[in-house]
């Protein structure tokens, strides 16, 4: 058994396929919104009472919009530092399913606790 720590943790060399795809998707949506001034957050955001407006699809899209650059950066840093290890352990398909399930369950939990009218 080796006591050496991996040297590529958090480096771009350690980025796995699903993590890379999610990074590109999240950053692209943020840039489209900011540079082209297309209000994707209005389309993708999760209203607190999504069931009243039949915004079921928002449960699957809200996780790709971010309030500001800091919000995006912190989320993507978490994805870069934790995602590859999880993806390598459970595989790309299961990682993607876990990412989506976590997002959907997080959205459901948030909508139960959020005040009406919140995004």
Listing of model-derived features with the role each one plays in the protein:
Residues 1-13:
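Short, Lys/Arg-rich, polar N-terminal cytosolic tail immediately upstream
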Residues 14-119:
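N-terminal TM1-TM2 helical hairpin plus the immediately adjacent luminal interfacial "cap"
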């Amino acid at each position: 058994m080796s006591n050496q720590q991996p040297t590529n943790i958090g480096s771009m060399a350690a980025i796995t396929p699903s993590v890379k795809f999610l990074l590109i998707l999240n950053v692209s949506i943020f840039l489209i919104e900011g540079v082209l001034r297309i209000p994707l957050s209005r389309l993708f955001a999760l209203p607190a009472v999504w069931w009243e407006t039949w915004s079921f699809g928002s449960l699957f899209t809200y996780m790709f919009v971010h309030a500001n650059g800091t919000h995006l950066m912190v989320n993507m840093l978490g994805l870069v530092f934790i995602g590859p290890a999880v993806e390598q352990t459970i595989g790309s398909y299961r990682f993607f399913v876990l990412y989506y399930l976590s997002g959907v369950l997080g959205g459901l939990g948030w909508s139960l606790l959020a005040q009406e009218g919140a995004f």
